[in-house]
Amino acid sequence: MADGEDIQPLVCDNGTGMVKAGFAGDDAPRAVFPSIVGRPRHTGVMVGMGQKDAYVGDEAQSKRGILTLKYPIEHGIVSNWDDMEKIWHHTFYNELRVAPEEHPVLLTEAPLNPKANREKMTQIMFETFNTPAMYVAIQAVLSLYASGRTTGIVLDSGDGVSHTVPIYEGYALPHAILRLDLAGRDLTDYLMKILTERGYSFTTSAEREIVRDVKEKLAYIALDYEQEMETANTSSSVEKSYELPDGQVITIGGERFRCPEVLFQPSLVGMEAAGIHETTYNSIMKCDVDIRKDLYGNIVLSGGTTMFPGIADRMSKEITALAPSSMKIKVVAPPERKYSVWIGGSILASLSTFQQMWIAKAEYDESGPSIVHRKCF
């Protein structure tokens, strides 16, 4: 690796809903934009308009009326590599304005990411972007680093997927990782559905963005769902109003806590899965009996879907009910948890001890994409 002190590694956390990118050593990502690639539905008729064949991120979002929008990452795992390449290109050249061939790049991956996917990421970085060095880190492990721990269980819930990942002394325990295909996007969909019951109709992809904003601004998690339902039905204390972009004002009441309740009761959206509290408990129970105490005492929340007010108290209450009665339970909800994966990456990539961990271009040229399994674990 080039031994210039001034070369800052790049950190890129590719989520299902948002890309978080920036420079190692910074305390927050410089660029945060939607993981969307949009292509025009119709060919341009105006000469000289300079229509692009694809738009990425916010630009795709703002032109969504004339585009077909695609998310290249589904449930946390890359499913469309051509579009993913466009997103990385946009990240480096338009958002961060850097030449990737001059910086080591740290990428993140979902837990239980297929082996072929890690190899493909590695290949694209070295062959398309000519990076001097790269590394692939597991998202949940980075969140734990960001909270200043090396042992604990992370509940990482984003837009497309949720995971519970037990980590011991810095290593994820793959046999105990559990995945739940229930996350932010499902909650937005559910809110769209229950708002329809109130007589408000939200159907298009543009309207989904409005509902997502309602969710982010007004939803919260009830400590006692039944009791909260009682309150909502008998008084207007939980009602709030929200102004739509066209000036119309809507009122939202019980929907505020009914929406994120799905995390604890997936049966509300017809899913057979266990809720996030049970999934966390099941994950802990798959671990060695000797380390469970450390896991119960370090339950760390991460990702945008854990941003609901009231989530830590409810989580604590639910897990206390499942765990052995003498067990000390601590749920940690760091205020910056929306970006804690990125922050953990920023910390890791700037550690002096990490510098020998990078996969260098020379090593890749010698061994090919499979080098990633030997160097990143």
From Swiss-Prot:
GO terms for molecular function: ATP binding; hydrolase activity; structural constituent of cytoskeleton. The modification N-acetylalanine is found at residue 2. Preferentially expressed in young and expanding tissues, floral organ primordia, developing seeds, and emerging inflorescence. Displays a very high expression level in mature pollen and pollen tubes. Little or no reproductive-gene expression is detected in vegetative organs, such as root, stems, leaves, sepals and petals. Keywords: Acetylation, ATP-binding, Cytoplasm, Cytoskeleton, Hydrolase, Nucleotide-binding. Its EC number is 3.6.4.-. GO terms for cellular component: chloroplast envelope; chloroplast stroma; cytoskeleton; cytosol; mitochondrion; plasmodesma. PROSITE patterns: ACTINS_1, ACTINS_2, ACTINS_ACT_LIKE. It catalyses: ATP + H2O = ADP + phosphate + H(+). It holds the Pfam family Actin. It is found in: Cytoplasm, Cytoskeleton. Belongs to the actin family. There are 8 actin genes in A.thaliana. Polymerization of globular actin (G-actin) leads to a structural filament (F-actin) in the form of a two-stranded helix. The binding of profilin to monomeric G-actin cause the sequestration of actin into profilactin complexes, and prevents the polymerization. Actins are highly conserved proteins that are involved in various types of cell motility and are ubiquitously expressed in all eukaryotic cells. Essential component of cell cytoskeleton; plays an important role in cytoplasmic streaming, cell shape determination, cell division, organelle movement and extension growth. This is considered as one of the reproductive actins. This is Actin-11. It comes from Arabidopsis thaliana. The lineage of its organism: Eukaryota, Viridiplantae, Streptophyta, Embryophyta, Tracheophyta. The gene is ACT11.
